[in-house]
Each structure stands twice: as C-alpha cells, then as structure tokens.
Amino acid sequence: LRSENVKVNVNFKCFSIVVFKLLHVMMKLFLNRLRRDHGVIVGRLSQEVANRQGIVAGHQYICDTMEREGGCLEPGEYHIMVAKCKCFARQMLFLEPIRDDSSSSLPLPETCKLCRMERKSHEFGCLEELYALPCPMMQPGNGPFRLRQGGILIGEAHASGVVLKSQERFLQLYDRMKKAMVRGSDVVVVIE
C-alpha cells in the first residue's frame, strides 16, 4: 500500500512538471549590438536553443540588424506582437517593452493614430517629426537613416549603413514568429 502511494506521488510530480512546461512556452530572441559605425548600430539577432530537458544549449543565428544611433531602443526585454501597421499597410513585428506598471509608452493604436496624423500634416514638408515618433518595430529596409524611433532593420549587414536581402530575411523572421504565436508561445527579444 505504501509503495503505491509513492508511485502516485512520483507520477503526479512528473505530470505537473510536464504540464508546467507546456503552459509556459516562450521563444526567446537575443539582439546583440556589435559595433557603432558612422551613426549606425550593427547587431546580430539569434534565437535561444534549448535541449529536451529545457537547458539552454546555445544560440542559433537568424539575421543581422541595423539601427539608427540616435533612435535606438534601450537595452531590455521586449514582447513581440504582430499587428497591422497603417504606414506600411501590412502586418509588422511591433516591440512592446516589458516593464513595471509605471511604463510611459503609448499603446499600439494611439501610436498608429499619431503616425497617421503626422503623415497627413507633413506630406509635402519636412518629415523630421514623423521620424521622431516612437514606433518600435522590426522591419525590412535598405538603410537605417529614415527609420523612426525604435525601428530595427532586418537583413544582412554589409557596408556601413547598407542592408541586403532585407525583405527575404524579414519574411523568414515573420513566418517564424507567426508560427510560434499560433502554437501559443510568447515571443520575447532581449536587447543587449
């Protein structure tokens, strides 16, 4: 009778660990900023790889990143959301900071509303105010000098300020994020 109780307790403990691991699935990305060059910050985006026991085994390279030095995000953790951007008229990867309750960042719909208003009022004039708007997202592009605050270009970094194969790399990353979210994973990027 006593050995049966031990078996039940051991099986229950294993079951609870498996259920906990299934409930808390998270995809963790790391953006390591490697160098600053002529107003550009070049980085590398990689994914944390874990073995079957859940122990981190290493990092898998995904793509290079490029940011404007004056408009880069603060180091920290950011939650990745997929939402439609009014400016690009397509689904984009938005970054939302993971902070305490005293966060002063604007919610996504308000940011997009500001973006629409700025685009309309500066259609034929200076776009400096549009680029100063905070809009943290990962996006395709050729160079970082027209990025808004918090924009991160995805692709292969070559010469100073030039990104190649950006659209291809962005679509690969977007598909990877979308599949993880459909499976119920939280996607987090750690910027270092």
Identify the residue ranges that each predicted region occupies.
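General secretory precursor processing signal
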Residues: 5-6, 17, 115-118
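Cell wall/extracellular polymer interaction/catalysis modules
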Residues: 26-187
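Short, positively charged and aromatic/hydrophobic N-terminal segments
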Residues: 21-23
